[in-house]
């Protein structure tokens, strides 16, 4: 008995000690057990009950917030657990600044996604010339306005970004022009990408890294918007509504480029506008593509003295100093310098274009062709028009493919009758990128019937590998002299061997592996309109004081017969399967003086392409030169793009002039020169510009389970003109490898307008779907041709470019170049998912940008997990039994010890 009493006393002491040290929580009571399984429950903003599979979840359920306060942890006593995402509203405040006046616009967009992993992208860019985006179309904006960028992104799990792209656009304007846009797009998986730019601001570097975070950590997308105007910048960090319940975090930083205003000085001192554009060379395990667009300058001078226009151009590699300018060109850094001097004695225009080289692994293929011409024509009390045209094609490499393809030969010979007062010299240099620059100056009525044409041919092989070699140039001299009363021209012919270039790269967007063309460069040089579009989309509308011309998808030529200069040029590079496209532009000068520029881009299977363009003038002073252009193409080249084209076959373009009106459908191509019998028996096939790339698509298509549509109305206003564009975007994807980025930088500018001209360019709409996937099946085939409307009497232009690269990546960049000239700019652009309506405003109103967002409700399926937890029957009777107290059993320590002591005493 004594032994039993001792044992009971010992047990009582042990229990009391254990109770003091480790409270018997929940052991002797029926209170619910607090179970933390690490599952997140993100509720809607309201406190309504959520009913899931017959269970009602009371809003009184105990929640515990994790460290980043991004989601709520549901702690119940067992049974059913829910993993879902709450519908969030993202409010992005866009700050627009113009003339030191800023306005803020709020954008609210809901974005939800449930994925497994996401990547962290940390992008750092200079705020002056670089905009870092993901899958974003772009266009140069040389007006003195602010740009606003709104990025809404959904970043799903384990998304591999298989494309690294760099696109640079530089556009210059005769007055109030200092701006440049350089867009660097980097998509990557687990590699480091470094971008270097040799520009006036500090070099920029883009690094991407993947940082592992704790599992089940919800992430938010933070967008930093930077709006700059007149050297004043404002930044705002916005947390977007892309809540992803994953183990990684996504952070984006977007910069809109800085725009500046410079006042033109009409004196003997030149107003210099410097345009700096950097070239980003990205090394990545995927495809790289670099595209460069250089736009030229147009100057008009009214003078009673002799006007001399000098145009010099130099293309070189590895930092060769240019002639007549201080710019240097290299394969990694490009600086364009534009200077214009206006006085009562004449006009001097300088222009330099840049070349960009894209480098990947062991593949590097580049070539260059640049021509320079100088001409001076005496003028007596007449208008002098300076015309510059440049077409820049950037080589793009695909993976580590390499092959040897015969190089095409370009032969350029021009023979012009002599005159005692005019001297024209043509020179050529070579650089690392195929760049063709043509300049001409024609003035007054003293130029009798002068015609000049030049042509450039570029070949693109259709093979899995490409390797180019640049052969040495053999200059040829051909000159013919015809007695003329007022003109003496010298002509030099130079023959260049231009290598073949592989111009396609593979990218993955929303599960689609398509062929993406990055070097679609469209340059129109009668109104300084530059339009760079992606995915086989190229459109430019040129308008001068008496003529308006439009080229959107085909190689159509529009020529006015008035005394002003009109020019168009389109460069179309089709899919690398024996598809040829041509582009040409013509300029009609006073007194039937014509300057024609023709560019032919051909993709042969194996044999080289030889394009010869010869121009000769009969020995009569008043006769018009006959021009002939022969295009030799491989017999295996077929016009196969028309059958698969759905984006621009119905596009119509109209040309409005003061006395001449011409309307040419986009699907019809015309050449300003006479096409003679080529050396080969292959016909001169004309193809449409927009070609479906679905035949080159590869990879699998992932099905999206839900899609939310966000309609953003971008309103761009400039003095007397407002343009509204509705863009449908916002795809909520619940998959495993899709990333969606959307960035907007709407443009505002100033333009003094009158009722001189009106343009209306309509782009056709096309939509294609694959199965039940609510996205575009072929990005290339369904991308509408974007019409770029530009209006100027040579100095000003307004360009609007809209590119829809995919269903989930939609970019709208409105571009306007303005100058105080008497023209009327009313562009109306329409493409897939966009509507543009011109709105008249005050002639003195301050430029402003308004972004409106209409968002449909986003519905995301919930993931239900059933987890078995051993609990008492009382706890299983109701989920609402969970409360915030720990149970009465924790307060029974003293009473339990008293009972044990009493039992021991009773035993004694």
From Swiss-Prot:
Presence of keyword Signal: yes
Residue ranges, compositional bias (Polar residues): 406-416, 624-638
InterPro entries: Flocculin_t3_rpt
Signal sequence coordinates: 1-20
Residues anchoring lipid (GPI-anchor amidated glycine): 887
Low complexity bias (residue ranges): 110-187, 266-324, 332-405, 422-477, 539-608, 639-655, 662-677, 685-700
Protein name: Hyphal wall protein 2
